[in-house]
UniProtKB/Swiss-Prot annotation:
<dbReference type="InterPro" id="IPR037728">
    <property type="entry name" value="C21orf140-like"/>
</dbReference>
<protein>
    <recommendedName>
        <fullName>Uncharacterized protein C21orf140 homolog</fullName>
    </recommendedName>
</protein>
<comment type="similarity">
    <text>Belongs to the FAM243 family.</text>
</comment>
Amino acid sequence: MPHFAKPLLRNIITRNLFNSIKKKQCLQYLQTLRTLQYDGFTTVYFGETDIPESLVTGEDFSDGYYMPTPTWCVVHAGGSQGWVPWKYRMFLRDELCIKQEDNLFFEFCDVVKKAYGKCAIVVKERRRQDATRPKEGKETEAQAHVPSVVNLTSVTCCPEVAKSYGHKLLTLPSPYNYLNPLDSAWSSLKWFIINNRKEFCLQSVDGVYSYQYILFSDLISKGIERINLSKWRTITTKVRRWENYYLGKLS
């Protein structure tokens, strides 16, 4: 029995250490965000989501036969003032494996500076394969608070680039990703695609074959447009309540 208890106890201790570090990261993130907001920084949430082609076409794989389909990556940002006045980007994931858009974050920082002035740019932390295996020692706890480059699928977000435009780049710890209202916006976009994709589809029959043309760009644009300022304020208000809750609980 002791032989099996030791690995179990080790896992419990490791998990508790991991949770403790993440809670401290979340508290520091919230405290830093509040300080920046009080100093006049506008909060904008920058991120991406995947749109599988099957979601757009409505293909049914319930018969068990699955054919891999291309996946598109949509990059945008928003906050309590609605979508950022920046032209969102769409990339085919296969192309992203070859090259990232190095200048995209520079362009974004320039646009939000002109639109809002100094900003707190929030990006979600990407989950790591070894996220449940924190390194031992105090070094891990210290490094948890040091901002670093955040590599999204399509763009590299660099703190020094943000700083050069007068902004501050913040990383939201992965266990608390629901504190990012952009996730709710992405969910609304995908539901819009599901419910309205037929309206953006053209059918063509030549006697032998049937073709389906999907106005993909128009579908995405209209879906983003439907998430208006009122909806953004609703989801950011909800996130604000959760932030206040965790500030009280973790302090």
